[in-house]
Amino acid sequence: MAPWPELGDAQPNPDKYLEGAAGQQPTAPDKSKETNKNNTEAPVTKIELLPTYSTATLIDEPTEVDDPWNIPTLQDSGIKWSERDTKGKILCVFQGIGRLILLLGFLYFFVCSLDILSSAFQLVGGKMAGQFFSNSSIMSNPLLGLVIGVLVTVLVQSSSTSTSIVVSMVSSSLLTVRAAIPIIMGANIGTSITNTIVALMQVGDRSEFRRAFAGATVHDFFNWLSVLVLLPVEVATHYLEIITQLIVDSFHSKNGEDAPDLLKVITKPFTKLIVQLDKKIISQIAMNDEKAKNKSLVKIWCKTFTNKTQVNVTVPSTANCTSPSLCWTDGIQTWTMKNVTYKENIAKCQHIFVNFHLPDLAVGTILLILSLLVLCGCLIMIVKILGSVLKGQVATVIKKTINTDFPFPFAWLTGYLAILVGAGMTFIVQSSSVFTSALTPLIGIGVITIERAYPLTLGSNIGTTTTAILAALASPGNALRSSLQIALCHFFFNISGILLWYPIPFTRLPIRMAKGLGNISAKYRWFAVFYLIIFFFLIPLTVFGLSLAGWRVLVGVGVPVVFIIILVLCLRLLQSRCPRVLPKKLQNWNFLPLWMRSLKPWDAVFSKFTGCFQMRCCCCCRVCCRACCLLCGCPKCCRCSKCCEDLEEAHEGQDVPVKAPDTFDNITISREAQGEVPASDSKTECTAL
């Protein structure tokens, strides 16, 4: 319910309205005359109106504004179980089973679409990501390493891929562990873009989008804040490198078995039918293999046979022969026998693009569009199914189970249990992106609060590192130490971040920052896309370019920018906490132009560009909804056209000045209630006022 508008001349005391009102009451003319005659002799009689007709009651007791971050109550408008007959109960059971099957099916395709989305990004930008790593000389700069880790992980949509590239480079002595640590930190930031993209799919409902986007970006802010604090500490002390080196030196482990595939056992059979990639090519490009640059990432041959044979080859002289017995010469040329290894292709892979012979960019673009469409469709259906299931008593039980703390004095343990649950679930699905992306719609519809989602997200950061540690233990001997040390660096980095931003409640800044961004994005929804472009592309690319130009350029540009940001933050803190210490002009931002202190002018600009597209989108939504209504027979399923309702609210909900009602308004309302004044006349009088 929308809050009451502020009244310009509201009087908190109802006596000021009701004094002398009896003189104008038509139902008691005699009493009013006597009251007017004795006005100077006796006190004025006050008439108490019913709360239904009294505007003074509305002024004195305003309705409390609902907190947008409160979990919404999903009312169950269906027929109660006790009121159903036998046929209705059986039908209800089958409907529940059908919804569960549909939910699991859409969740399966949702996870598969995330896997294909990662493959699409690797096809589009995988070779470029490998070229970022190919220049190992620039990797010694920690800031450049951080930015490269962010950009590469955003391009390939997989922190596991970027981490495996780093491991292969470290094991090949192309990169040191010290230079690899900032890249791992950047990969931790880049992997959080996936669930932020998923949150954009709930943009149709402002309330859901506010919660979903805040729940997704709490992961971003945790990673950014952790890097801002821990990267300088690591550069100064190298504590991650030292701790992990001691742990690795204490191990005397041999090569283990491969890391267990849990969720991938279910999803691989389907995703392999869509596309299969040769991910070794990206690592080969990173290690400056020129032949790999001309190879396609799309895997064509799945079954090959490697054979060795002896062939005659020409050598410059007899000194190059393999042995004297295998060396022949005619005085002009010299031959010898050499063992040559060749690969023989036996069977092709079984996927859609195996015989298309399209370039990687074309295949990646096709898969990117299709995977985003499937991702959006699955997410919409998951939200709708959950919204239809999580109602009434079921919703109450689930919300209380997830969001309720342990009884005192063990309430503080609840968050740490949530961290363990998040780590365990991420270990099962073997991807933090999959877990946090599945968490996002639940936050949007109000099943999980932001405060509970935060420790679950922190646990997912821990869970993805345990998977990397198991994978490192299964590495071959030449890569075991380096891969294990890098996986442990990733693990202790996330542990350090949790110690910084979770144990003490007032240090949980990511929650407050995510809520602030959620409020802004709910009001100006274009700002969510702006945030993604700025934080995951423009800022890393700008820092990358300035770093390549030299440290003098980086310092000359970066120091003033950092100084301005710190100054603005300090001013904002003083304005909110103790504004009296500031000059009057600096107690607010009104001294700045409107476009520098408000998003309203920018919103007007973006609205002009997006207005036409939004209207066309709404028309398509209405057509699709009506077709859906015809199929399912439900007259209320057109709620998916909420963008149209938002447009109508935007046009109708303009700021109209509302004045406090005078005594005459009370009289008019009472006359209308008694039937003496027609409703149309009263509306005309109110309009004239």
Swiss-Prot record:
Chain positions covered by the region annotation Disordered? 1-41
Instruction: Tell me the compartments it is located in.
Output: Apical cell membrane
Q: Know the name of this protein?
A: Sodium-dependent phosphate transport protein 2B
Its transmembrane ranges are 101-121, 136-156, 213-233, 363-383, 408-428, 486-506, 526-546, 553-573
Query: What is a biological process (GO) this protein takes part in?
Result: intracellular phosphate ion homeostasis
- Give the keywords, sorted: Cell membrane, Disulfide bond, Glycoprotein, Ion transport, Membrane, Sodium, Sodium transport, Symport, Transmembrane, Transmembrane helix, Transport
Please give the catalytic activity noted in the UniProt record.
3 Na(+)(out) + phosphate(out) = 3 Na(+)(in) + phosphate(in)
Q: What does this protein do?
A: Involved in actively transporting phosphate into cells via Na(+) cotransport.
Judging by the UniProt lineage, the source's domain of life is Eukaryota
- Origin species: Pongo abelii (Sumatran orangutan)
The principal location of this protein is membrane
Q: List the disulfide bonds.
A: C302-C349
Membrane topology note: Multi-pass membrane protein
One GO molecular-function entry: sodium ion binding
Glycosylation positions in this chain:
N294, N307, N320
| NCBIfam families per the UniProt record, alphabetical | 2a58, Na_Pi_symport
Among Pfam families, the record links this protein to: Na_Pi_cotrans
Q: Which residues lie on this side of the membrane: Extracellular?
A: 122-135, 234-362, 429-485, 547-552
**Residue ranges, Cytoplasmic side:** 1-100, 157-212, 384-407, 507-525, 574-687
Gene Ontology terms: cellular component: apical plasma membrane; brush border; membrane; vesicle
By sequence similarity, the record places it as follows: Belongs to the SLC34A transporter family.
- Does the record bear Membrane in its keywords? yes
